[in-house]
Amino acid sequence: MPLMTPPTCLPNVNTRQDYVRIYRDADVWLPAMQAICQRHGLDATQLEFAPPGTHIVFRVRPDRYIKLFSPLWGEDFVPERLVLCQLSGRSDLPIPQLVAEGEIEEWPYIIVTAVEGVSLDGVWRSMDASNKEYIAARCGELMASLHSTPTEGLETIAVDWPDFVERQIQNCIDDLIHADIDKQWIRSVLEFL
């Protein structure tokens, strides 16, 4: 009897263009997220796509997130996992706690707790100046606390700043293209960056 290959639940992504083309299509990622939920005893009926970002993120109601790392940027998995472990248990920082990790079809993933709050994207414009000042001050306090964290154990994280900056610029442009922003405006942003 011939060996049968198991069905795949993730798309074949070989290039950045492949990834960008399907990134925002939640239905593409749902089978993998359902499989991860089943593997870890989470309710797969409570999945909610949670872009934007470089990697695929779904919220599992009520209080978990699954982050799936594309093999194109698989090197992002280890540093994120190490930093989450390093910051675990800090009561002064609202940090997601690492619940589980694994791999599905050679795509690494983590499951973390949700940090309550709202995205500034949705509320910043409607906030008055005093609230914005409070948030800015609080962000400064959080950054100071984060920067005071010992870095022992994080030495293996290699940071190629030119590559990182280039990826951030490309991600920005991709987001603008997907938001259907005028191409002339995108060119202006690219010149600025």
What are these regions (language model features)?
Residues 24-42, 116, 132, 136-137, ...:
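An alpha-helical support segment within catalytic cores of ATP-dependent transferases
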Residues 4-6, 15-18, 90, 95, ...:
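FAD-dependent flavoprotein oxygenase/oxidase catalytic domain
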Residues 2-33:
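Phosphate/pyrophosphate-binding loops and the adjoining catalytic core of nucleotide-dependent enzymes
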Residues 7-15, 35-36, 44, 76, ...:
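A generic structural signal for ordered alpha-helices
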Residues 10-12, 71, 90, 128, ...:
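Short, structured coil/loop segments at alpha-helix boundaries
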Residues 2-7, 48-65, 170-173, 177-189:
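Short N-terminal secondary-structure initiator segments
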Residues 45-160:
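ATP-binding pocket architecture of kinase catalytic cores
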